[in-house]
C-alpha cells in the first residue's frame, strides 16, 4: 500500500552544464527550468520506488510547475516530492513538488506518475517503430 505523505528530497550543486544557457532554454547562466523539472520528477520517482513490485516502473504523465526565482552557478539546489494521493486502482500517484536553493523557494507545483509494467510499456513503445 502506497502511503500518503511519503517524501524524497534530492540535492545538487548548480554547474554550468545545468544552466538555461547550456540547455538552450534561455540565454542566461542560471539553473535551467528543464533541470529543475527533472530533479522534481526524479524525487517523485524515488519516493515511489520502494512501493513498486518486481517488473513495475513509473512514468511521469503530468507536471505543472512554476520556476519563480533564479539560482546562480555554484549554489546548492534541493527538490522534494511528497505523495498526496493515489487513485482507487492504485495506478496513478499524485505529488506535491517543490524546489529551493540556499536562499529560499525557487519553484513548485504538482506532478503525476503512472505505475506501469515495464516490459509491456517498452514493447508498446517499440511497436511505434514498426508501424
What are the language-model segments listed below?
Residues 1-32:
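Catalytic strand-loop segment that frames the active site of acyl-thioester-processing enzymes
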Residues 9-15, 66, 112-114:
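Generic structural detector for well-ordered beta-strands
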Residues 65-102:
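Hydrophobic beta-sheet segments that form the core/acyl-binding groove
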Residues 112-131:
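C-terminal output/interaction extensions
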Amino acid at each position: 500500500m502506497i502511503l500518503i505523505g511519503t517524501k524524497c528530497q534530492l540535492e545538487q550543486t548548480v554547474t554550468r552544464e545545468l544552466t538555461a544557457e547550456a540547455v538552450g532554454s534561455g540565454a542566461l547562466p542560471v539553473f535551467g527550468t528543464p533541470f529543475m523539472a527533472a530533479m522534481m520528477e526524479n524525487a517523485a520517482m524515488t519516493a515511489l520506488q520502494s512501493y513498486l513490485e518486481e517488473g513495475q516502473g513509473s512514468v511521469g504523465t503530468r507536471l505543472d510547475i512554476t520556476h519563480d526565482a533564479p539560482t546562480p552557478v555554484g549554489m546548492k539546489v534541493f527538490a522534494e516530492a511528497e505523495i498526496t494521493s493515489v487513485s482507487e486502482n492504485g495506478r496513478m500517484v499524485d505529488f506535491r513538488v517543490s524546489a529551493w536553493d540556499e536562499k529560499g523557494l525557487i519553484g513548485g507545483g504538482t506532478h503525476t506518475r503512472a505505475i506501469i509494467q515495464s516490459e509491456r510499456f517498452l514493447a508498446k513503445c517499440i511497436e511505434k517503430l514498426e508501424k
